Amino acid sequence: VLSDQGALFEPCSTQDIACLSRATQQFLEKACRGVPEYDIRPIDPLIISSLDVAAYDDIGLIFHFKNLNITGLKNQKISDFRMDTTRKSVLLKTQADLNVVADVVIELSKQSKSFAGVMNIQASIIGGAKYSYDLQDDSKGVKHFEVGQETISCESIGEPAVNLNPELADALLKDPDTTHYRKDYEAHRVSIRQRSLCKIVELCYVDVVHNIRAVAKILPSTAFFTDVN
């Protein structure tokens, strides 16, 4: 599939966001499950084995996630794309509706208490990546993009919807320490949820940029853009 450039990408002007969105969607549909022989990682579903998030230090709230299963990245849409051909830098932002399911241990470190269960998060996000690039000739004189180190950003659109399995929700509801902290938690709930979600998203977008880097090694620069040389 990847040897057929026309099937993988539609070359676009760097100014044509509609074309870039179509081309990105085409690539994601082809490669979202990963292509190991080209070092393209699966991103939908994207699996993260474990992640610890210090969610709110004031009450010692820590989320210990395991077996995170993230879906929705294959349907991400470009919301912003800026390419500076003089400085050879790219700003890419995409919007996606994500669904996250994970085993979780919710720790209240100040009380030495933990509660285990399953968490489901649903949210709309904007993930961003800034990276440098260069154009390099391969052994046959064909130009390829070489993608530099990325800086990842994340924005949660509104408040993420969070659901816990009934046993975990019931345990948190009845525990005296969680009852004591509930008012403080509720006052900061939106920012806690957004910050925790973005820690997950940032790991996801490392793989998204990795795949951009990987496919740039396979295809010539002309497979991506009509106005970069």
Curated annotation (Swiss-Prot):
One cellular-component annotation, GO: extracellular region
Signal peptide stretch: 1-3
Entry keywords, A to Z: Secreted, Signal
InterPro entries on file: Haemolymph_juvenile_hormone-bd, To_sf
Localization, UniProt: Secreted
Disulfide bond positions: none
Pfam families to which the protein is assigned, alphabetical: JHBP
Biological role: Prevents juvenile hormone from being hydrolyzed by general esterases by combining with it specifically.
Name of the protein this chain belongs to: Juvenile hormone-binding protein
Source taxonomy: Eukaryota, Metazoa, Ecdysozoa, Arthropoda, Hexapoda
